[in-house]
Amino acid sequence: MRRRTLLGAALAGAAVTPAFAFGTARAADPGPSVRRTGTTTLDSQAVFFVSYDGLVNNNSFQKNGLLTYKGYQYAAWYTADRNAVVARRVLGGTWSTVQVGHTLKADDSHNVISMGVSKVDGRLHLTMDSHSDGFTYVKSVAGLMDNPAGLSWTPARFGAPQSTLDGLALTTQFTYPQFVSTPEGRLQLSYRVAISGNGRNALAEYDGSQWTALGEWSSSTGTYTSEHGSSTARNMYLHGIDYDGNGRLHSFFTWREQNGAVMCNGGGITNHDTGYVYSDDRGRTWRNNAGTVVGTTGGSDKVAVTDTGLVVDALNPDHSLMNQESQATDSAGRPHAIISYVPGRFGQCTTNYVSDRTANGRAFHLRKNASGNWQKTEIPVPLNSSQRTKLVLDRYDNAYAIFPFGRIAAASAASGYTDWKILFDGSGLNAFGEVVIDESRVEADNVLSFMYQEKSSGTTPSALHVVDFALPA
C-alpha cells in the first residue's frame, strides 16, 4: 500500500478545502442553526469516575446510549450505586426509569451500555459492561417499542441478564458493542474480538427469532511499516457502522498497531490512517473505495492493513490520531466523517497524546463529494480536550460537529462545508467531556439531542442530563 512520508502526511492533514468548493444544497436551503429548547435530568447522582480520560456514561462510541423510536426517547446509564438502568419518555415528556438487573463490575470507561431496536419484533436490546472480557445482554419483551403508550415501563418488561445472546456465546474477549438496524428491520451487533492492538471486528444478527454469528471481517495480521519501525499485529477501530437510505453499509476506520516501535515517541498512540469500506449485502462482503471486494465476513479473506485502496486520508502514527470518532451519510448516501489529530504545523512528533491533543488537537471534516473525490476541511475550533467530536447532518445536509464539553460548530452544505463556525459554546452545561448523540432523533423530529454528564472529582457522583436543540425546519 502506498503511504505518504511523515512530513507529507502531516501537512496533508492540515489542508483546507478551497473556498470555491460547493455542496449539493440548493440556494434556498437554510444554513445550519441550533435553538436550545430544553434540558432534562436523567439522574442527579450518576456514577462518576475518570478512566482512559473518559466516563463510562458518556463515551461517544456508544451505539446507542440515547435513541428515539416511534415518538419515544430512550437512555441508558449506570447510577451512583452502579445499577444499570434504562429510561424512556414520550418526546417532550418526563423520564421514567427501570433497573435491568445488572451492576457495573469495573471502574473502566469502556464498559458502556449500548442499546438497539429490532424493528422486526419491537424489542429493545442492551449489551453492557465489557472490555476484552465477558459481556452482559438484556432484551425486552416483544412489542415494547411498538406500543410504548400501551405497555407499562417496568422491570418485568425485561428478561434476566445473560452472558450470551440467547445462548450464542460470541467471544470471551468482547468490546465496543454497536447496534445497527438493517433496512429489513433485523438488528445487527458490531463488536471487537480480542484486544487493542491485536483484535478483529465481527458481526452478529438477530432476525426476530434468534441471533446468528456472521463472523469476523477484519484481520489483525500483516506487516505495517512506518518511518520508525514495523508491527505485525493490530486492530481496526471503527468510526461507526451505518446504513444509508439506499441500504449501503458504511464504515470509516483507523488502524492501531500493537508495536510501539512504529511511533517516533512512546508517549504517542499507534493509530494511523483513515480508511473506508462499504457493504452492499448487509455486511457479508466489504469493498474498498474503488468497489473492489477486500473482505468477506466469516470467510478467510478479511479486510487487512495490506489491502490496497483502503486509505482515504493518510497519516502516520506520530500525530495522536483519535480512534472511534464519528461518521454520517448525507441525503445522497455519500459518507462523511470527523477525524482529529495534532496537525503537522504543531510539530512532527507527539510525545504525550492526551496533553498534545488537548493543547494542539484539531478536528477535520472528511467527506466524499459529488464527483467521488475525498475532501477534507479543518474545523477552526481547538479541541481543548483529548476526547472525541461527533458528527450530525441535518435534513439539508448541513454538518454539525459536537465537540467535547457540548460545544457545537457547524458548516453549510451550500458552502462546500467551508464556513465552519461555533453556534453554541457549551455555556451553562458544565459538561465533563464527550457527549452521546441521539442519531435517530435528528431524522425523527429534526432535533439534535445529546446526553452529557457534569464535571465532578474523584468518585463523587454527578448529574446526567439530556439537552435538546431544534435544527432548521
Task: Say what each PLM segment does.
Residues 30-473:
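Extracellular, repeat-based ectodomains that mediate carbohydrate processing or recognition
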Residues 5-24:
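N-terminal export signals
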